[in-house]
């Protein structure tokens, strides 16, 4: 989303001398000029004072797969102390699937059946 993922990705791209894609070049743009839809913002409905975790939101919406043995604040230790990239990869993959399913639910579209999701 706009509060962590985008800034982090943009900083890493700049640090590695990579061009930032136009979709991430949001500075100076008006909200209606930005094509990104943040599922967390969609859920907030303008309410900035409350936070709902992805796991809780998925549970409320009946979406499977959000329960993980890992959370974003643990990734640093899992990488630097355990060196367990497979665990981080699995966590990220599940997050992407859950966010995509939430996006579909928020737009009143059919969810993708678990047997139709191929994890690469």
Language-model segments: what does each one mean?
Residues 1-89, 94, 102-107, 111-116:
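Metal-dependent phosphoesterase core characteristic of DEDDh/y 3'-5' exonuclease domains
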């Amino acid at each position: 989303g706009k509060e962590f993922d985008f800034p982090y990705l943009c900083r890493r791209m700049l640090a590695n001398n990579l061009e930032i894609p136009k979709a991430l070049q949001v500075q100076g743009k008006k909200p209606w000029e930005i094509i990104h839809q943040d599922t967390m913002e969609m859920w907030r409905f303008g309410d900035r004072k409350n936070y709902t975790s992805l796991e809780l939101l998925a549970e409320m919406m009946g979406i499977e797969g959000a329960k993980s043995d890992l959370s974003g604040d643990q990734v640093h230790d899992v990488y630097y102390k355990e060196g367990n990239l497979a665990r981080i990869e699995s966590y990220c993959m599940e997050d992407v699937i859950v966010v995509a399913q939430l996006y579909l639910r928020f737009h009143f579209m059919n969810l993708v059946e678990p047997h139709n999701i191929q994890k690469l």
